[in-house]
């Protein structure tokens, strides 16, 4: 199943959580926090303004992003957990 987001929505795959702390302690699955970083896997066509024009999104497929802990709606597609969120829920793009 493929999810094609509408308007200013973005589909994000969470990046894997770090399972060790900085001091080397291994965290069990329940203790590890869900990461607040992900990779954009699909983007909508853009937000429609009051004048009817469409503003393209600033993020694109493949971008690594940072988002809020409670951002987006969790959905499952082909057994994979994804997030669907608005572009305004994204804090920034991680650049290398």
From Swiss-Prot:
Keywords: Chaperone, Cytoplasm
GO annotations of cellular component type: cytoplasm
SUPFAM superfamilies: GroES-like
SMART domains: Cpn10
Gene3D superfamilies: GroES chaperonin (2.30.33.40)
Gene Ontology molecular-function annotations: ATP binding; metal ion binding; protein folding chaperone; protein-folding chaperone binding; unfolded protein binding
Entry-linked Pfam families: Cpn10
Subcellular location: Cytoplasm
Disulfide bonds: none
GO biological process, alphabetically ordered: chaperone cofactor-dependent protein refolding
Main location: cytoplasm
Stretch forming the signal peptide: none
NCBIfam families (alphabetical): PRK00364.1-2, PRK00364.2-2, PRK00364.2-4, PRK00364.2-5
Family: Belongs to the GroES chaperonin family.
Subunit text: Heptamer of 7 subunits arranged in a ring. Interacts with the chaperonin GroEL.
Family matches, as HAMAP family: CH10
Job of this protein: Together with the chaperonin GroEL, plays an essential role in assisting protein folding. The GroEL-GroES system forms a nano-cage that allows encapsulation of the non-native substrate proteins and provides a physical environment optimized to promote and accelerate protein folding. GroES binds to the apical surface of the GroEL ring, thereby capping the opening of the GroEL channel.
Protein name in the entry: Co-chaperonin GroES
Gene of this entry: groES
């Amino acid at each position: 199943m493929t999810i094609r987001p509408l308007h200013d929505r973005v589909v994000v795959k969470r990046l894997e959580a770090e399972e060790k702390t900085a001091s080397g302690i291994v965290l069990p699955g329940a203790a590890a926090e869900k990461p607040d970083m992900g990779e954009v896997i699909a983007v909508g066509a853009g937000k429609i303004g009051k004048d009817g024009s469409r503003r393209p999104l600033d993020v694109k497929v493949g971008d690594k992003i940072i988002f809020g802990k409670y951002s987006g709606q969790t959905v499952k597609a082909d057994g994979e957990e994804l997030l669907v969120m608005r572009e305004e829920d994204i804090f920034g793009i991680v650049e290398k």
